[in-house]
Amino acid sequence: MYAVLTAIIAYLIGCINNAYIFTKYTRNIDIRNYGSGNAGATNVLRVLGYKAAAPVFALDVLKGVIAVLIGKYLMGNTGAMIAGIAVVCGHNWPVFLKFRGGKGIATSVGVVMTVSPLLGLIALAIGVTVIVLTKYVSLGSITGSVTFVLLNAIFWNSTQIFIFSLILASLAIFQHRSNIKRLLAGTESKLGQKTEIK
């Protein structure tokens, strides 16, 4: 019962789409109609720049943190992981936006930094390094997600947290499947390339 309650609460928190809300009320646009069509911080960055993307990213991270803390309060570490997966699913497929959300990376950052701070920080640092070196946000996001899985395999804590990391990485890779195709084709947008709003 608590597991279901935890998942529902976390999912609904994830459904609060900060990219959509911020751009709708500050620029009167639906961010999903611009750039990559993704309702997330990276697309806000691409379309509106750093000043708009920063609060969206921060709020997306925060909702991951809040969901995990609620899950931990209700069910301990198991609840934290259930909530972590559910909040990312809510971000990716929000019921209030007809299941068209973001890719879950910023929210995943909040989740892993709360569930496993040290390994989360290492994975984040590696992901950011890849972004800085290549200018591909998608590549850095995927790398960071996979790194978190590998770190959990190397510094084994429990089967539960390894499966948790594997699910999070799978969600990230699935949401970036179109980016992977563009990366392979050499057509993926780099950090700094901006889409103008007419």
From Swiss-Prot:
GO CC annotations, alphabetized: plasma membrane
Annotated InterPro entries: G3P_acylTferase_PlsY
Domain of life: Bacteria
GO biological processes: phospholipid biosynthetic process
Statement: the UniProt record of this protein carries the keyword Transmembrane: yes
Membrane topology: Multi-pass membrane protein
This protein's name: Glycerol-3-phosphate acyltransferase
Annotated source species: Thermoanaerobacter sp. (strain X514)
Gene name of the record: plsY
